[in-house]
Design a protein with these regions (language model features):
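Structural signature of tandem alpha-helical TPR/SEL1-like repeats
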Residues: 41-54, 75-89, 110-123, 144-157, ...
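Terminal, low-structured helical/coil segments at or just beyond the last alpha-helical repeat
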Residues: 30, 306, 311-348
Length: 348
């Protein structure tokens, strides 16, 4: 799963920073901190950084200001090294600052330091065991590192805390499906689409699992829901077209393949299947054009030459062009015995 790392601002109750004679300095530092917080919410990152540096200048032992400054550096200015330093300073001043450990872990992820990221996220969870964002980030980290067992465990822990966590439901369902645990995956994804009926990826994954199980009616409905939720979902349109073609629903299938190539003009397989459908519809000119486009896109696609050869042989009754096309199919590694026999007999 491929998610963008986003640093989050923790809601921190500052209270009374200092007592007695230093209260005015504390108030001044807090004023700049609150000003920085407001500027962050407005997207004014340069101004926010300046306000927070003033707060720290007035009150050097101000962990919340360092933490927010780290967020500004990371999110607003992409100064990741400076962000990491700010989070480390916040942690130095407040070793129980779970949010600072969490955001430091996210910075390490962006910097490509997975070991360090894991350490910081675990520290955040040691302080705050029910820290959902940290648990989710840790699960994603494990998944990116292909540590599927650890990822499954982390996602399961998160769902135990929050059963309606949509990202975790999808991620764990995806992992289970990749491990061949189809029923467990289906259960999670079904829960997800009940919570969010327009979750296109969940519908699509349910469709692919149903298709693998040869439950084509179920797969068809899932793909239809996927494209309804996301009309530009290329693979869902393609898979739906393939199922409709297998059912003999030629015009709806052709429409799905046309939509596919409109969305992704270099989708050779979609052009090839569109050619098959056109041939079955006796739209021979359109079929030939679709096959030729397939070969233009994928000149070494043996299956495209096979289908074009069949088209010439059976639909156009053009044995000469069929033979030329079949020869190219065999040159590219095709192994169909009937085609091999035809080409062999001509040579003799």
């Amino acid at each position: 799963m491929r998610s963008r790392v986003v640093l989050t601002i923790a809601v921190v109750a500052l209270g009374i920073l200092l007592a007695g004679g230093a209260s005015s300095a504390a108030d001044e530092a807090k004023k700049y901190y609150n000003q920085g917080m407001q500027q962050v919410s407005q997207g004014k990152y340069e101004a926010a950084a300046e306000s927070l540096r003033k707060a720290i200048e007035i009150r050097p032992k101000f962990p919340e200001a360092y933490h927010l400054l780290g967020i500004v550096y990371a999110n607003g200015q992409r100064r990741l090294s400076d962000a990491a330093d700010a989070f480390k300073k916040a942690i130095e001043l407040n070793p129980s600052f779970a949010e600072a450990f969490y955001n430091l872990g996210l910075v390490y992820q962006v910097q490509g330091k997975p070991v360090e990221a894991e350490q910081e996220l675990k520290k955040a969870l040691a302080i705050h065991p029910k820290y959902e964002e940290a648990l989710f980030a840790l699960a994603q980290l494990y998944e990116r590192q292909q540590a599927s067992g650890s990822a499954v465990e982390a996602y399961a822990q998160l769902l135990a805390l929050r059963p309606d966590h949509q990202e975790a439901l999808y991620a764990l369902g995806y992992l289970y499906e990749s491990q061949g645990k189809s029923q467990e995956a289906k259960d999670l994804l079904t829960r997800l689409v009940k919570l969010r009926t327009d979750h296109a990826d969940a519908h699509y994954l349910l469709g692919t699992m149903a298709e693998k199980a040869n439950s084509l009616a179920e797969a068809e409905q899932a793909y239809k829901k996927a494209v309804a939720a996301r009309p530009d979902f290329v693979d869902a349109h393609y898979n739906l077209g393939f199922i409709l073609k297998s059912k003999g629903e030629l015009e709806p299938a052709a429409q799905e393949f046309r939509t596919t190539v409109k969305l992704k003009p270099d989708y050779a397989e979609a052009y090839m299947n569109l050619g098959v459908v056109y041939a079955l519809q006796h739209k021979f000119s359109e079929a030939e054009q679709a096959y030729e486009e397939t070969i233009r896109l994928r000149p070494k696609m043996a299956e495209a030459y096979y289908n074009l050869g069949v088209f010439y042989e059976f639909h156009m009754r053009d044995t000469t062009r069929a033979l030329v096309t079949y020869k190219k199919y065999l040159e590219l590694g095709g192994t169909d015995e009937r085609v091999q026999r035809i080409v062999r007999e001509v040579k003799q």
